[in-house]
Amino acid sequence: MLLAAGRGERMRPLTDTTPKPLLPVRGKPLMQWQLEALARAGVGRVVVNTAWLGPQIAAQFNDVFRLQPALNKHEQLSIQDSLQIRYSHEGQDFGAALETAGGIARALPLLCPPTGAGARAEVFWVLAGDVYVPDFVFSPAAVARFLAGDKLAHLWLVPNPAHNLRGDFGLGTVDTGGPTPIGLALNLPAADPRPRYTYSTIGLYRRALFEPPWCDIAAGNPLGIKAPLAPLLRAAMDNGFVSAELYGGRWTDVGTPERLRALNLNPPSAQP
């Protein structure tokens, strides 16, 4: 699920006429970087939620996103070149965005459709349409590892940027036995001195996190209930059901005109 429903208040006046995920970053709409990464990973379908200026997003990408032929021939032969897009139009249906958990609950029937014999898909990626993370790999191996465990969510954390020096979540003892060091995500008390990291907005989620007892919103969110994601995550963390790992690649929360300007001025190889 690609989150694209926010108003982008801090990005005004740019977002008065353009939804933040469509603002240009290094020659293409910001959310196109995520669509390309998903397509390169072989993800076949993405749900995009919209609210503020949502019709512009649907008009930009329509129902199918195809990779441009800029990749070399070997890459083109090894990846899926198109991505089916479904839209969850929160603004059209309810007049405003439903926040992250409310939006995911609204999109859940699209995210986890029946797979046959009454079964439903269990896990899905969630990522924001307003972060720049050009090197992230939506790894099928990460999905398989997540499916094999019992966690409700797995988060990618990043070092704290200047605008979020306090961070969001802690990271428990890291297991280095596998190919990627993984630990428990921690909901640390305010006085806890252990380091916190910033949630990158990229994560793997299990459908069960958005169902009772964790979430009381009905699948499809027919009443348009607004609900943030953080309380669900913190409750699951307190019960040991959220894992995390550190991501060290390029990552920018493109939240203000100044950050957008800096990103477009810096050379592509630079760490913003």
Question: Would you name each region that the model predicts?
Answer:
Residues 115-116, 124-125, 132, 137-148, ...:
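Catalytic-core segments of class I nucleotidyltransferases/pyrophosphorylases
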Residues 1-58, 69, 138:
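N-terminal glycine-rich phosphate-binding loop and ensuing alpha1 helix
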Residues 23, 86, 250-252:
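Structural signal for short hydrophobic segments within the conserved structured cores
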Residues 25, 94-102, 223-227:
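Conserved phosphate-coordination/catalytic loops
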Residues 1, 45-47, 86, 125, ...:
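A structural signal for isolated positions on well-ordered beta-strands in alpha/beta enzyme cores
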Residues 16-22, 92-94, 218-219:
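Short glycine-enriched, charge-decorated loop/helix-capping segments at active-site entrances
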Residues 64-168, 173, 212:
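Conserved beta-loop-beta/alpha segment of the NTase-like Rossmann-fold superfamily
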